[in-house]
Design a protein with these regions (language model features):
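Beta-strand-turn-beta hairpins that frame and shape the catalytic cleft
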Residues: 1-6, 143-147
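Active-site beta-strand/loop signature of hydrolases that rely on acidic residues for catalysis
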Residues: 6-9, 20, 28-57, 73, ...
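Short polar catalytic/cofactor-binding loops
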Residues: 10-16
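Glycine-rich anion/phosphate-binding loops
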Residues: 18-25, 62-63
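Generic structural signal for well-ordered alpha-helices
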Residues: 28, 66-69, 141
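Active-site environment of divalent metal-dependent phosphoester hydrolases
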Residues: 47-48, 88-90
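Active-site catalytic loop in hydrolytic enzyme cores
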Residues: 61, 90-147
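A short, hydrophobic beta-strand-centered structural micro-motif
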Residues: 62-88
Length: 147
């Protein structure tokens, strides 16, 4: 059995996708330099902001996220799990929360659309309701050999 090193990246995402991509790349590069085989980005790595902005950006942001993951995997020669990012769903009033697993060669290995949506009232009084604008996917399991 060979050694395998995974890196779990933590970010403080904002409503500015470009700055989020820059911050994510810095962490991916660091993880790769330290020998990571797999880099996991957090949910909402590319955008964390108002629902109305997320819905407006969803189609563009979904493409940007997929391209970003492919570029990073190839550039740093790591497998990347891009934790949830918004993808348009239905009539445009909902998004799916999608994660993609991309191989070192930039090939999409697996895709997962979130099933269990999260609702909470934060201590600062701001409610967070994925169920309001989030689409629900169907259960499914994919097993991938990333070697």
């Amino acid at each position: 059995m060979s050694d395998f090193l995974a890196a779990a990246v933590q970010l403080t995402s904002t409503s500015d996708p470009e700055s989020n991509f820059t911050a994510a790349e810095e962490q991916i590069e660091l993880a790769a330099r330290r020998g990571a085989d797999l880099v996991g980005l957090p949910e909402n790595f590319a955008f964390m902001g108002e629902d109305s902005t997320r819905l407006a950006l969803a189609s563009t942001l979904a493409d940007q996220c997929s391209r970003f993951l492919v570029t990073m995997a190839r550039r740093y020669q790591v497998v990347i799990l891009g934790g949830g990012f918004p993808v348009p769903h239905g009539d445009g009033s909902h998004t799916l929360n999608r994660a993609e697993l991309v191989g070192r060669d930039g090939q999409l290995l697996a895709r997962y659309d979130k099933i269990h949506l999260f609702d909470v009232d934060l201590p600062d009084g701001i409610p967070y309701r994925e169920s309001t604008t989030g689409g629900r996917s169907r259960p499914g399991v994919t097993v991938v050999d990333s070697r």
